[in-house]
Regions:
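Secreted/periplasmic carbohydrate-active enzymes, especially glycoside hydrolases
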Residues: 1-15, 21-385, 447-448, 464, ...
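Extracellular/periplasmic catalytic domains that process cell-envelope and extracellular macromolecules
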Residues: 27-28, 130, 173, 338-339, ...
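Flexible loop/turn segments at secondary-structure boundaries
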Residues: 144-146, 186-190, 206, 353-354, ...
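Short acidic, Pro/Gly- and aromatic-enriched capping/linker segments at domain boundaries
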Residues: 324-336, 517, 605, 764-768, ...
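Substrate-binding/catalytic cleft of secreted carbohydrate-active enzymes
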Residues: 382-624
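Ligand-binding grooves and catalytic loops that recognize ribose/phosphate and carbohydrate rings
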Residues: 417-440, 446, 781-834
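Catalytic beta-strand/loop cores that center a nucleophilic Ser/Cys/Thr
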Residues: 511, 785-789, 805-903, 920-962
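Short alpha-beta junction capping motif
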Residues: 757-803, 884, 912, 963
């Protein structure tokens, strides 16, 4: 009885449909539905729409939410590319393949999985009062293709991943009916690419179902939809275009009025009534004045309006709609973008459709507002939706928050399809992006559009050129590019802006500095250049995060990585690995983002990404986790110091100096706001480790908006520094929260003399080494370049890129290192517990030692953090008791001559040798010398194999991308 009352309940409400709302009657279809799985795809031939389906589910929702589907197994055919097959074949991973407890390393794991056809069925009642109305079936987001029957009559088919599925039921008689919906989430009809974030199991999951609003709607039979508003901030006019479906003579009057919101300033724009509107190409065109001082929408002032439209027909029917819009202009201006005439710089992140609790994107505005406000708190003003388009709630939230969006067609036409070769996906992209314009085109946050991500196809350039021309001629409210691509993809010359990977990365094969920029990459083009997928620096998994997976997807990958770490005797090191690798990750993002900010005429960047990516082998590239929560090693306040609308920048040739040098730094101010900062006082100060200011100064400067401004030079003679120490340089604008800082290290050219005659320093494990140890002596064994066990493990100063599974163990393999800075061994070497710039020359491309034969409890002094897929026990420096003696073994770049250009390396050697001469040199672990010999003579027992010949595009020859 209760369900019947629900079905009969009719409410007068405001329906938000894309960018507009209309007064109407609705009947909610949420609730219990009959259900059946059609594994053999026989439902149409057997006329299931004429039968009552026996199972049941609750909608809105997915099959997974309703516990429907097949148990995940080794035979599960994921909608995803997997290039690392080691999990399926490696004997050491056999226990993770147990049918009772499968732990996939490649992606988050659902309990059930299903790709194919499923049927949904519900009894409905159409009121008699609706008979003279247009009746619409509205399904906000379906996954993927739907076919609808009312009783035994086929109504139609829809296939959209970006927009509501709507069906006209106006010819259906009043009374009781059975609605049957067939949903197919396979890629058989239209293959957008199995790794597209709109469908892939790497991200949201390839779900089957309907989410969001589900309802029957009754509106006037003359109802006019797809009303689009085109603001012109120069003329202060909004052009309203209303496509006609009925003859003009039937329209009696159109009334318009606008009211502002989301702004401290309130405006009510006067009513305008039109009785004879202009008609151009079967479209009513109305010019509506916004008054003398309309409020403009931007990241700084996201003022919005509701345009109330009332259409009256001669037969007495009327239509009322309230359309949200903003007065804004987002354009290309030379090599940069402009917002309302002001130069802007896009500081963006990808949003990859990772929602572990539900397995699909949120349909409520509040959750999207939470996510976008987090993005903004980290200094970002832009979001790219990788190969998918979010629901309307995301656009509404971005309107409120002030974020520039780049949704994309729902395709990564690669890895199972191609673009421009005549496949169904070619027309589908045009259809889908037109649907995006219809439902979301009025949102001011919708500023940019691309077909999707990194396509394959011999004719992709021709196709994307046509795509750009089509859209730039059709709708000038936003700007267009063909595709978001890396460097190996062919150039589309007619792009209004470029998204390429040339303006990203750190050149840390050479000494780190902060003078260089990406000018060479961006100056190759006359249009704005956005760095494609900047970052991708990994941190170690946060196993505390496992408890947050309380929904439909479980972090079995994290559980597997945790077990592997524990098997290696390092389970108690997980938190240290997370924090140390996280600090290195932030250091990389800081330096790469600052390099982007100091590039003149740069268009911006798109990080990959602010939060973690759940799939493709588990890409822990975010400073936030998959839930957009902090991991503990950086927060928004810290991150936004170097990523914001205004950022102090410091140019210098190095971060490591000797006390015979002078520190020279150039201060400039990145400032992309709407106003200049006149008579700014820019302070700088240099502090020692105790926080004492050793040098400071102030610059007085006008900071101009929309560019970088040179502020002044800092010079500091370092001769007064007699001992190795870390200094901090701070630069900020007085009276504001805009400040930034950098660490530099100063090492003495002349070190205090210590008598090292009691230490046998050697680069070979020779006979004398054993003699010294057996007689109770001390040995420093420098095995740099001589390591065999671990030679296959590549260490650089930079951490793992994306992850080693997706890229088939492409180097580097480590995530920085962890040490105890309070250990006496480092008493004379300034360091924290993690990698920092003073370690670059010491650690970069140095060998690691694989301690696979050492006791599980053995802990080195300098411990590289291995890729979490293997968690091998590694060392760069370790100490031990051997025989009657004691030894330190190092594989780092440590020079012995006093004239070396590696002052940090000399200082580290000094600190270690001084430690060896002290009473504190008392290693906890005793080992046999054979273990050390094994490091130099025996290869690792375990060598990784991917058991696969396939590879991602980045590992393929360029010629294969255009096939």
């Amino acid at each position: 009885m209760f369900s019947k009352l629900i079905r009969l309940f009719i409410s007068v409400s405001f329906m938000i449909c894309g960018s507009y709302s209309m007064a109407q009657q609705t009947i909610s279809l949420a609730g219990e539905w009959n259900f059946a799985i059609d594994r053999q795809n026989e439902g149409i031939s057997q006329k299931w729409f004429e039968k009552k389906l026996k199972d049941s589910v609750h909608l809105p929702g997915s099959m997974l939410q309703n516990h429907k589907g097949d148990k995940v197994s080794l035979q599960t055919k994921w909608t995803a590319s997997i290039y690392d097959s080691s999990w399926y074949f490696s004997p050491r991973l056999a226990k993770f393949r147990s049918p009772d407890n499968l732990m996939f390393p490649f992606l988050l794991t659902p309990a059930l999985h299903y790709v194919g056809v499923a049927w949904y069925q519900k009894e409905i009642i159409i009121p008699k009062s609706w008979q003279n109305s247009r009746i619409n079936l509205f399904l906000e987001r379906c996954h993927t293709g739907t076919t609808v029957w009312i009783d035994d009559q086929l109504i139609g088919t829809e296939n959209s991943l970006v927009a509501p599925h709507e069906y006209d039921l106006s010819k259906v008689a009043a009374g009781k009916h059975m609605i049957t919906i067939r949903i197919d989430n396979s890629l058989d009809v239209i293959n957008v690419g199995q790794d597209s974030h709109s469908v892939t199991d790497h991200t949201q999951g390839n779900w089957n179902g309907i989410i969001g609003r589900m309802e029957l709607q009754s509106v006037t039979k003359h109802f006019l939809d797809n009303i689009q508003l085109y603001p012109d901030i120069d003329s202060k006019i909004v052009t309203i275009k209303i496509p006609l479906h009925e003859k003009r003579s039937e329209i009696k009057q159109i009334s318009l009025s606008a009211k502002s919101f989301n702004s401290p300033v309130q405006q009510n724009i006067p009513l305008q009534t039109i009785t004879h509107p202009a008609i151009v190409n079967d479209t009513i065109v109305i010019q509506y004045s916004m008054g003398k001082n309309p409020l403009l929408w931007s990241e700084f002032h996201p003022a919005l309006y509701n345009m109330h439209i009332q259409i009256k027909w001669n037969d007495g029917q009327q239509q009322q709609q309230s359309i949200r819009f903003g007065m804004r202009s987002f354009k290309v201006m030379g090599q940069q973008f402009s917002i309302n005439g002001y130069t802007t710089f896009l500081r963006g992140t990808l949003e990859n459709c990772v929602f572990p609790l539900t397995g699909y994107p949120p349909m409520d505005e509040s959750e999207w507002e939470r996510i976008l406000r987090i993005c903004k708190s980290y200094g970002l003003n832009h979001v790219r939706f990788h190969s998918y388009c979010p629901p309307k709630a995301a656009f509404e939230a971005a309107d409120i928050v002030g974020i520039y969006l780049q949704p994309e067609g729902p395709s990564w036409a690669n890895h199972s399809t191609s673009l421009g070769d005549g496949k169904p996906v070619d027309q589908y992209i045009f259809d889908e992006t037109n649907r995006m314009e219809k439902y979301y085109g009025n949102h001011p946050s919708y500023c940019m559009l691309a077909y999707g991500n990194e396509p394959r196809g011999r004719h992709q350039v021709d196709y994307l050129t046509k795509f750009i021309h089509y859209w730039e001629n059709k709708d000038a409210r936003r700007v267009y590019t063909g595709a978001s691509v890396a460097m190996s993809w062919p150039i589309v010359p007619d792009n209004q802006y470029m998204i390429k990977s040339g303006a990203r990365g750190l050149t840390w094969n050479h000494q780190p500095e902060s003078n260089s920029d990406y000018s060479k990459a961006i100056n190759a083009f006359k249009v704005p250049y956005i760095a494609h997928e900047l970052g991708q620096w990994c941190a170690f998994p946060d196993f505390k995060e496992i408890s947050q997976y309380t929904g439909l997807y479980k972090a079995k990958n994290f559980e597997m990585f945790r077990d592997i770490l524990s098997e290696q005797g390092m389970g108690n090191e997980a938190e240290r690995f997370l924090m140390a690798s996280g600090k290195l990750q932030v250091l990389c993002y800081k330096n790469e983002i600052e390099k982007s900010l100091r590039t003149p005429m740069n268009g911006g960047f798109q990080m990959l990404s602010l939060n973690d990516y759940a799939g493709q082998g588990t890409a822990l590239v975010g400073v936030l986790n998959a839930f957009w929560n902090e991991k503990g090693y950086v927060n928004a306040k810290e991150f936004s110091r170097f990523c914001n609308s205004t950022v102090p920048l410091l140019k210098t040739k190095s971060f490591v100096y000797t006390n015979q040098q002078t520190f020279n730094g150039e201060v400039e101010m990145y400032h992309y706001s709407e106003t200049d900062i006149k008579n700014a006082n820019i302070y700088w100060r240099i502090k020692n480790k105790d926080g004492k200011i050793v040098k400071d100064g102030v610059f007085d400067k006008d900071i101009l908006a929309g560019k970088n401004t040179f502020v002044g030079n800092i010079h500091f003679d370092l001769s007064s520094i007699s001992s190795a120490q870390q200094l901090k340089i701070e630069v900020g604008i007085q009276g504001t929260n805009y400040n930034n800082d950098w660490n530099i290290w100063v090492f003495p050219t002349k070190l205090p003399h210590i008598d090292t005659s009691k230490i046998y320093y050697t680069t070979k494990l020779d006979t004398k080494t054993e003699v010294v140890l057996n007689s109770g002596g001390k040995v420093f064994l420098n095995v740099a370049g001589e390591v065999v066990k671990g030679n296959e493990i590549a260490q650089t100063f930079s951490p793992v890129f994306w992850n080693t599974s997706w890229f088939k163990m492409r180097p580097p393999h480590t995530l920085g290192f962890v040490i105890n800075p309070d250990d006496a061994a480092f008493a004379d070497f300034p360091t924290s517990y993690h990698s920092d710039m003073q370690w670059w020359q010491i650690i970069n491309k140095s060998q690691v030692m694989h301690l696979e034969d050492f006791p599980l409890s053995f802990r080195p002094l300098v411990q590289p953090i291995d890729t979490w897929f293997l968690s091998r026990r590694l060392a760069s420096v370790f100490e031990a008791k051997v025989g009657k003696g004691k030894i330190i073994v190092s594989s780092l770049h440590i020079p012995t001559d006093t004239t070396s250009i590696n002052p940090a390396g000399r200082q580290l050697l000094y600190s270690l040798e001084k430690y060896m001469l002290s009473n504190q040199f008392n290693p906890k672990s005793s080992i046999d010398i054979s273990l050390i010999k094994g490091l130099l003579t025996e290869p690792s027992k375990y060598i990784f194999s991917s058991y696969s010949n396939g590879s991602p595009d980045e590992l393929k020859p360029k010629s294969q991308i255009t096939k």
